[in-house]
Regions:
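Short, acidic/hydrophobic/Gly-rich beta-strand patch recurrent on exposed beta strands
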Residues: 109-112, 176-178, 307
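Accessory substrate-recognition/RNA-binding modules or partner subunits associated with SAM-dependent
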Residues: 120-122, 126, 131, 135, ...
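Short, solvent-exposed loop/turn elements at beta->coil junctions and helix N-caps
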Residues: 80-87, 152-153, 161, 165, ...
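Short, aliphatic-rich beta-strand segments
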Residues: 99, 164, 171-180, 238-242, ...
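Nucleotide donor/acceptor-binding cores
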Residues: 92, 171-173, 270-271
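Rossmann-like S-adenosyl-L-methionine
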Residues: 2-31, 186-188, 192-415
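Extended interfacial segments that mediate partner engagement and assembly in macromolecular machines
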Residues: 35-39, 49-149, 169, 184
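N-terminal hydrophobic or amphipathic helices/low-complexity stretches enriched
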Residues: 27-41
Length: 415
């Protein structure tokens, strides 16, 4: 999701918490009068990750559009939401938690809503299908290789999670085995057996998470097969994806989202751009072709390493990356009297903070392009910016997560 940096706590597909209220704004809710959908998920009542299960896709879009219009009414006109032609199997990053029941049955899938009880899921209607097949086969292989699942309560066991990432344009597949120990019994034979079932796998990585924590990924990666990363293409550029780095999960909508963001920047080839919360550098690298200079700022170390590599991979020479907190970095820029023509900000769902927003005001860029994945925090941040000299020109919502309540939005603000 745009702006989510570093590690994460739970399955981002099925167990994300609902938006927190900001400035008294209503959160997005499912309408009681709704058209039924033919796409029925057998796990809906147990999993609870898809807020709009059983709702016709057109009705989902209508509800989200109405919500965004109401939320952003004080600021600007809201353009029609950009939906998907095919709203199924869109997630190209799939995470499964592993556990064992009291009867000894191995389960793999999503956390039951607001718990850490694992719901055993064979396939998910919003997840890339080959990724689900890989997870299913890993689950079936555990007993023959005598690999025990990790028990959060006791701290015993080995396999905690499996993360599968697949490049939409390249087809490259990365499998990340999250273990409580760096030692995987018969690791070579395990990888060989897995690749025999799925020869399309590009790389297999062992991630070590040996702490009593709800965080999914640990800090250490051991490559068991391949290069330890995959690549994908977006808007004509090639990007490296490592186990812990941020990369949008819906590539079809992401391309449209980023193209809109760069279009709203109105670049002529001379502008100095600040790409805040830049992740692996995707937006900044794509924009650099039409800009004078781009400065990318990101807190996640893995992501910033990938960003530097991505710039070199695409022969982009007018971009620099800094491993720093975006808010702190912008404050220091403002204190030094530095200027920027455009700020592109892509914060996490919690939105930005006042220190960052005040630094934007001090830098006084002519245009601010806000890429939001949290509507209510977006409204909160727009309220601050409009009080300090900016006018919101327009907002365009994108449905990057069909069957969930989440909405991404590109907003243009001008001095």
């Amino acid at each position: 999701m745009a702006g989510n940096q570093g590690n994460y706590r739970e399955n981002p597909t099925r167990n994300e918490k609902k938006y927190k209220k900001a400035n008294g704004q209503p959160r997005l809710k499912e309408k009681s009068s709704r058209a039924k959908s033919d796409n029925v998920c057998p796990y809906a009542k147990k999993c609870g990750g898809c807020d709009y299960q059983g709702v016709e896709y057109k009705e989902q879009l209508k509800t989200k559009q109405a919500y965004m219009k109401k939320l952003l009414k004080p600021f600007c006109f809201v353009e029609p939401i950009v939906g998907m032609k095919n709203p199924l199997y869109y997630r190209h990053k799939v995470h499964a938690a592993f556990d064992c029941t009291r009867r000894g049955q191995i389960v793999a899938g999503a956390y039951r809503k607001n718990t850490h009880d694992v719901v055993d899921i064979e396939s998910c209607m919003i997840e890339e299908q080959e990724s689900d097949e890989i997870i299913r086969d890993i689950k079936d292989m555990l007993r023959s290789f005598r690999i025990k699942t990790y028990d959060e309560d006791t701290g015993y066991g080995l396999l905690r999670h499996v993360l599968v990432r697949k490049g939409y344009a390249t087809g490259q597949i990365m499998v990340v085995l999250v273990l409580a120990s760096p030692i995987l019994p018969s690791k070579n034979n395990f990888v060989k057996a897995l690749r025999k079932k799925h020869p399309n796998i590009t790389t297999v990585v062992l991630n070590v998470n040996d702490k009593r924590t709800s965080m999914v990924l640990g800090d250490r990666n051991i490559t068991l097969y391949g290069k330890g990363f995959i690549e994908d293409k977006l808007c004509g550029c090639t990007f490296r994806i490592s186990p812990g780095s941020f990369y949008q999960v819906n590539p079809v909508q992401t391309e449209l989202l980023y193209e809109k963001a760069i279009h709203e920047a109105h670049l002529t080839g001379k502008e100095r751009i600040i790409d805040a919360y830049c992740g692996t550098g995707t937006i900044g690298i794509i924009a650099a072709k039409n800009a004078g200079e781009v400065i990318g700022v990101e807190l996640n170390r893995d992501a910033i390493r990938d960003a530097v590599t991505n710039a070199k991979r695409n022969d982009i020479r007018n971009i620099r990356f800094y491993n720093d907190d975006a808010g702190k970095f912008m404050v220091e820029m403002a204190q030094k009297g530095e200027k920027a023509d455009v700020v592109i900000m892509d914060p996490p769902r919690t939105g930005s903070d006042e220190a960052f927003l005040s630094s934007v005001v001090k830098l006084s860029p002519e245009r601010v392009v806000y890429v939001s994945c949290g509507p209510e925090t977006l409204a909160r941040d727009l309220k601050y910016l409009t009080k300090h000299g900016y006018a919101v020109k327009r907002a365009t919502p994108y449905d990057c997560f069909p069957y969930t309540e989440h909405v991404e939005t590109v907003v243009l603000l001008c001095r």
